[in-house]
Amino acid sequence: SIVELGKMIIQETGKSPFPSYTSYGCFCGGGERGPPLDATDRCCLAHSCCYDTLPDCSPKTDRYKYKRENGEIICENSTSCKKRICECDKAMAVCLRKNLNTYNKKYTYYPNFWCKGDIEKC
């Protein structure tokens, strides 16, 4: 769920998801128009694409369990949906950490109408 995703983002990046990522660029927090603005925004596109592979799941509301061992996120076994949601969220949090150097404050609260052009395919 968005609760666990938020915790993972804090643990991996040290940034609060709100406002850092909730309205970042063209893909973080919804909108999904135009090409990603940078590698951070591309992490959000990849996360959206991952969720698209889970049509029978409820990734924003299904709660799941995970733990951290030696600094790594471990998705705990539960239902197939919850495990797959956790893996999508983990991939996003790790991607955001790996791309912290591309994070640009000017893309926070980026107006969605500025996102123009063809949407990048998954």
UniProtKB/Swiss-Prot annotation:
It comes from the Eukaryota. The keyword RNA-binding does not apply. Keywords: Disulfide bond, Myotoxin, Secreted, Toxin. CDD domains: PLA2c (cd00125). Expressed by the venom gland. Negative results: does not show antimicrobial activity against E.coli and S.aureus and does not produce appreciable hemolysis on human erythrocytes. Its main location: secreted. Coiled coil: none annotated. Signal peptide: none annotated. Residues 105-117 are annotated as: Important for membrane-damaging activities in eukaryotes and bacteria. GO terms for cellular component: extracellular region. Belongs to the phospholipase A2 family. Group II subfamily. S49 sub-subfamily. GO terms for biological process: arachidonate secretion; lipid catabolic process; negative regulation of T cell proliferation; phospholipid metabolic process. The keyword Disulfide bond applies. One of its GO terms (molecular function) is calcium ion binding. It is found in: Secreted. Snake venom phospholipase A2 homolog that lacks enzymatic activity. Shows high myotoxin activities and displays edema-inducing activities. Has cytotoxic activities against HUVEC cells (LC(50)=12.2 uL) and human lung adenocarcinoma A549 cells (LC(50)=8.5 uL). Monomer. Disulfide bonds join 26-115, 28-44, 43-95, 49-122, 50-88, 57-81, 75-86. It comes from Echis carinatus sochureki (Saw-scaled viper). This is Phospholipase A2 homolog ECS_00014.
